Amino acid sequence: MNENVIKAALLGFGTVGTGVYKVLKNQEKEMSAKIGCKVEIKKILVRNIEKAAAKIEDASLLTSHWDEIINDPEIEIVIELMGGINPAREYILSALEAGKHVVSANKDLIAVHGHELLDAAHENKVDFLFEAAVAGGIPIIRPLKQCLAGNHMTEVMGIVNGTTNFILTKMTQEGMEFKDALALATELGYAEADPTADIEGLDAGRKVAILASVAFNSRVVFNDVYTEGIAKITSKDIHYAKEMGRDIKLLGVARNEADGIEAYVCPMLIPSSHPLATVNDSYNAVFVNGDAVEDAMFFGRGAGELPTASAVVGDVFDIVRNILAGCCGRIGCTCYKNIPVKKMEDTHNRYFLRLKVEDRCGVLAEMTAIFAKYQVSVAQIIQKDTKVEGCAEVVVITEKVREGDFRTAIEELRNRDSVRKISTIIRVYGK
């Protein structure tokens, strides 16, 4: 290693890769002063060199051959920004086994194979850091691992997908319906051409798996996380929520309960007074609770070229400091506990239920009898003025109930002739 230069390689030169290159170049002098040496990008792995060459002054940095990176002893840090499971997994494992440190922003990979990658880093006495894999530019992985390490963490929850938060903000503030807000998000570049991963909660689910694993020191993988999206939310639901002093947000929730970990993503009604209710547009926020710190919230841009690059470069600098101090690879995977992850039907929540029923005497009594049969306590029943074709619209708010019991009650309601339609079911955050 040159005393004044540590060399790195970028895998991928898309939005985030370009951002990382820009940050390292633009802040070169200041960063050198901060950490005592320069970080230099020696190689950039791309699929299409001709296309990538248009985005960089020195095209000699570009390569389409992994061997030029893995076999170069001068390259000490590999920055993986390719996305996807393979070949990213193979590249990262081979880099770690070759004694190279790795920074990754790959939530898809880490949510499934994070344990394997961290163990490989520990075995080879190198670092594997992934701050940018969750919530872009918001520092949350490092605080959970370091600043909050003295806490028993009980809850990590938040808004961790900017696309869906933008859509719900437009629906709330401008009365848009879902499809119109999605079209606007696509037009402005917040939503991908195929928005499924965002609007169905899959993107947020991967982040919840990572957050839960780090916060609770127990392995949670993506398949453990229940996911539900926002496509069924209507402006009417948002209006009724507002009448009750609540907002609808797509929340990623992880709780460390006495009988296991709860991990899920779904739309939820939260009090308008809750700090997360004020997080709008494409911003993200993560709210944590620990036995010592109590409540804390981290807020900022959850995606984008430079916010995500900020987190990646922060990890690079941490590794450089460790290299200079000779203390790399000290801690591997911290999932030393074996806490079971609960099935969604065994979680407990309150529920908002909107349905259309026959407009006649006795229907509400029938409903409450069915709820009572399955131990579903009703906090509130509101019959709305809306009446169409002999039907009345009813809103029900339950107390906390086991989800499996609630689902069984709902199925019985669906089979009643007096219940014409169950329009919406949304979980309610809080007591």
Protein language model annotation of sequence segments:
Residues 1-98:
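N-terminal glycine-/serine-/threonine-rich beta1-alpha1-beta2 phosphate-ribose binding loop
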Residues 47-49, 67, 107-108, 115, ...:
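Short, ordered loop/turn segments at secondary-structure junctions
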